[in-house]
Amino acid sequence: MLALHEWGARADPPLLLVHGLTESATAWPDAVARWSSRYHVLAIDQRGHGASPRWDDETLARAPQTMQEDLEKTLALFSEPPVVVAHSLGGLVSLRVSVAWPELVRALVLEDVARPTGHWAPAPWFVEHQERFLDAFADGGAAERERMRRETSWSESEIEGWAACKRRVDRRYIREGTYLGEADLVSAINRLRIPTLYLAPRRGDMAPEPSEVTNPLVRLVLLDGVGHCVRRDAPEAYHGLVDPFIEAVFAGTGR
């Protein structure tokens, strides 16, 4: 089973946070601080990240399916469906699970979902890039922390959370498992049967075109002045959209 972290009162409405590549459950510090007084906040370490199990030959041979099954098993533990809040790779996994098992997810918040291109093996350029990136944290990542302080508006807690999880990434997954499989982003979005808020940068290269989203349950919001991690680049804009959405979802169910 995946490692599961939790904050807040168990009697409160549940949120499940699903992180992206090279991150972990502890890389949401500001969101957790904001939400844990009102919600039971849980977050997973995806396989090969944080304290979760490492990858092996069998799981790597079907990496996208393995990640989907990992999340399905976690959701099956909940006594009631949570609102799932997910970023990048975690967004794609959560999207696919929500399409396959809508009864396990109350609603979905997606942040710049990783876009699959139909490949079934890692791209060498991507592997090389990620390996170099993670190598920069071999000494704890002091230089990378300083770079992010110079180049971004992220809070200190977010920079620390982002940096701290890098040394716990399973490098074998980076080398052998970072492929996303079927190019199903748009079709999956339009097959969702739960309320969904999808945030992405307007100048990004992964979000669907607004005209492609024909599902009335999905609200796609493209934001200016942000990059891949919307919640860190523009936390007030992010929470100004996400918090009312979550509140409305639970209000509609009597929670």
Stretches found by the model and what they are:
Residues 86, 90, 94:
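Gly/Ala-rich beta-loop-alpha elbow adjacent to hydrolase catalytic centers
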Residues 217-255:
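Catalytic active-site module of serine/aspartate enzymes centered on a nucleophile-bearing elbow/loop
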Residues 27-29, 52-59, 120-121, 209-210:
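Conserved catalytic-core motifs of eukaryotic protein kinase domains, centered on the activation segment
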Residues 119-124, 136-190:
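Conserved alpha/beta-hydrolase catalytic His-Asp/Glu region
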Residues 33, 42-85, 240, 244:
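Active-site loop/oxyanion-hole signature of alpha/beta-hydrolase fold enzymes
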Residues 5-54:
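Conserved HGGG/HGGXW glycine-rich cap/lid loop of the alpha/beta-hydrolase fold
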Residues 95, 99, 104-137:
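Flexible "cap/lid" loop of the alpha/beta hydrolase fold
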